[in-house]
Amino acid sequence: MLAKDRLEGMSSSTTGGASTAYAAELTFALTLADRADAISLSRYQALDLEITTKPDNTPVTDADKSVEAAIIEAITAQYPNDGIVGEEFGSRGDKNRYWIIDPIDGTKNFLRGVPTWATLIALVENEKVVASVVSSPALYRRWFASKGGGAYVIEGVGLSGTGSDAIKDLAGTAKRKLSVSKVLQIADASIAYSDFQGWGARRASFEKLLDSAWRSRGMGDFWSHMLVAEGAVDVAIEPSLALWDMAALDLIVCEAGGKFTSLDGVDGPFGPNAISSNGLIHAAISAALNGGK
């Protein structure tokens, strides 16, 4: 049976009790992640990796460009009327329904041989993320969600060289449904952050927040937010992000029962920064970060 048929035939019990109108798009996004993983893994720790510097002084590798180009090619063939927003090759097409691509989130980790990097893929319709995939083959994990369909993780992705098991097992037992934590107070919370740079006027409030938490760790990038979705971390905060850094994360966190906003509390991934949390302590985190502004 084809992956598309398997997903569209899933009962409400296998989708967490909710049907989804975006089953076909989610399955397609998973095939995009398969293609991305095959390219990125083939270039990970490659001795001939090509690295250049973009105008914003951030690095880009030949793997970033190859992954994004492959995803664009596939989207254009499958959904020719959809728009595309990519980190490396810019924007094109429809602004009511478009795909957002971060070919390798964590490029600095990728080029140094640190396994914390991923391909982020999201579909936006009428300014709402409706399907998303975060695939991290070097960590052997893939997270995915569709609007109203819940959020899941497949573990073991990448062990065979591709992520095809995520599709094969989508209607089976290998996927694990995600649910955020139930922590109610900052004093009991585990907080993940990117780094100490970029906080500007919020720097003092940021440091005070970390001091008041039960635990804090500098993880950063997609990894922090996926741990929020898994319930392993209660809060993830980052002071400066682009849309392609956040779009795929937003839906997965929210479908796991959490909340995703800008530091100023605006819902969704369209601000310049992000807080993701279990939702229960979101207001307290936002207030704490804005106290020193």
Where are the predicted features?
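N-terminal subdomain of lithium-sensitive/metallo-dependent phosphomonoesterases centered on the IMPase/IPPase/PAP
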Residues: 1-104, 160, 165, 280-291
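Residue-level signal for inorganic ion chemistry
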Residues: 40, 64, 75, 107, ...
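Generic detector of well-ordered alpha-helical packing
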Residues: 65, 69, 88, 103-106, ...
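An extended, acidic
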Residues: 170-174, 178-293
